[in-house]
Structure formats: C-alpha cells, structure tokens
C-alpha cells in the first residue's frame, strides 16, 4: 500500500519509523518548509529521517496549496497518515488517497486543538 506521512512533531517521526520498520511502502512525506517550521512550537525535523529512506519529500507552508495537491496526485497514494500539522486539511486533499486519510492527535478534536493539547486537557479537567 503506497503511503504518505505528514507531520512535524515527534508523532510524525514515530509514524515514519514504525511504518518503515513494519515494511510499509512509504513513498513520501510532507513536512513544513523553513518559514512555517520557524513559527511552530515543538517542531521536530522529520526531513532528515526522510532523507535516509529514499522517500520523496515535499516541503510546504500550505498543506492545501495547488502544488501540494498535485504532488499528492502524482504519487498515486493509497493511504495517508498525519501526525502533527497546524492547518485543517481541506477535503480535496483528504480525498486523494484511495483507501483513506488517518489523522492522529493527542486529544479530542476540535476541543483539544492547538499547542500542548495534553497539558490543556489536564488543566481543563478532562478525564479521557
């Protein structure tokens, strides 16, 4: 299954490492470009890990751009896994992978969106 990983947090690195270790066919990764990365807290560089895999790398400051959409289409993706991105991903991007698009987040959405979702969930008294 042709898979793409999206993200810029520790979770994205874990997704990439785990899928590759399990023998998945990871064909690409989307990471923030330098401009976007410099504005994000908890940024973890995923691109250096991607460089060691031979996967295609796409750097962008807008996950919903026409350029990113066309990049997704060219890769003929079956599945996309997203772990840590700062934008809401538009339906036209979500609809590209044939088998689906899975997003991973460490709190309930939309209530827990934003930075430090686990911390804020605890501060707010969430029990799940």
Regions found by a protein language model. Give the residues of each.
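One-carbon transfer enzymes
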Residues: 1-128
């Amino acid at each position: 299954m042709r898979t793409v990983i999206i993200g810029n947090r520790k979770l994205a690195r874990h997704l990439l490492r785990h899928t590759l270790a399990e023998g998945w066919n990871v064909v690409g990764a989307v990471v923030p470009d330098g401009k976007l990365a410099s504005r994000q807290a908890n940024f973890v560089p995923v691109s250096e890990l991607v460089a060691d895999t031979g996967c295609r790398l796409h750097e962008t400051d807008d996950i919903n751009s026409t350029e990113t959409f066309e990049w997704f289409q060219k890769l003929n993706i079956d599945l996309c896994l997203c772990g840590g991105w700062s934008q809401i991903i538009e339906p036209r991007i979500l609809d590209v992978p044939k088998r689906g698009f899975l997003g991973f987040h460490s709190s309930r959405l939309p209530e827990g969106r934003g930075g430090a979702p686990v911390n804020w969930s605890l501060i707010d008294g969430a029990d799940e």
